[in-house]
Regions:
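Intrinsically disordered, low-complexity regulatory segments
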Residues: 1-155, 177
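Prokaryote-biased recognition of long, low-complexity C-terminal linker/tail segments
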Residues: 145-196
Length: 196
């Protein structure tokens, strides 16, 4: 039987298990996680951010060098097939699904997003019976997080290097806040005066 449907998962370790449970006309393949990243060279901003700050913080994505062969294979397999996106049911999985939609030019009307909590015939086939569109809000939150991480990390870290003449220092979206909380707590402990 010819394969008319392509179901894409994140992990290549899940491919064989899922292939056993899908209908015969399905082919299961992996995108091996994230395959696009924010551009680092020849960016519109000229700073290597891959974020066009002047254009509403528009991200510039490129295919990761190490994933070029995976992308080439997925594009070839996707020709004349119905595409099913079965990436992990979390924010990053939704972002990977969004990137797949963009890469494979899947129109909104043909989005088939499925999730399942366990790799069983019942769960997988129940999901296939009830596909839904991608959750663009969740995908956009992952993309926004990547943009914020890059904006903060690529601007704060060089400032720390220059200010303290120490190339081992870095700053980030989470790291900087956690460091401040630790310092505040340590200061409170040090300044504590017992009332006994």
């Amino acid at each position: 039987m010819s394969k008319t449907d392509l179901l894409i998962v994140e992990s290549k370790n899940k491919v064989a298990s899922i292939q056993k449970y899908v209908p015969e006309h399905f082919l299961v393949e992996s995108c091996i996680g994230h395959f696009r990243e924010l551009k680092k060279k020849n960016t519109k901003d000229g700073k290597g951010l891959g974020i066009d700050v002047a254009n509403n913080f528009e991200p510039e994505f490129v295919i990761s060098e190490e994933k070029l062969s995976v992308v080439k294979k997925l594009k070839a397999l996707a020709k004349n097939k119905t595409i099913w996106i079965a990436t992990d049911p979390d924010r990053e999985g939704e972002a990977i699904g969004w990137h797949l939609k963009e890469l494979l030019n899947i129109p909104k009307s043909q989005e088939k997003r499925i999730t399942f909590s366990s790799i069983t015939k019942k769960d997988i086939n129940d999901a296939i019976e009830k596909p839904k569109p991608l959750d663009n809000n969740m995908a956009e939150s992952a993309i926004a997080r990547a943009i914020i991480d890059k904006l903060i990390g690529f601007t704060v870290s060089p400032l720390l290097h220059k200010t303290f003449n120490n190339w081992h220092l870095s700053g980030g979206r989470v790291q900087s806040v956690v460091l401040r909380l630790i310092i505040e707590r340590e200061t409170a402990v040090r300044d504590f005066k017992s009332t006994n």
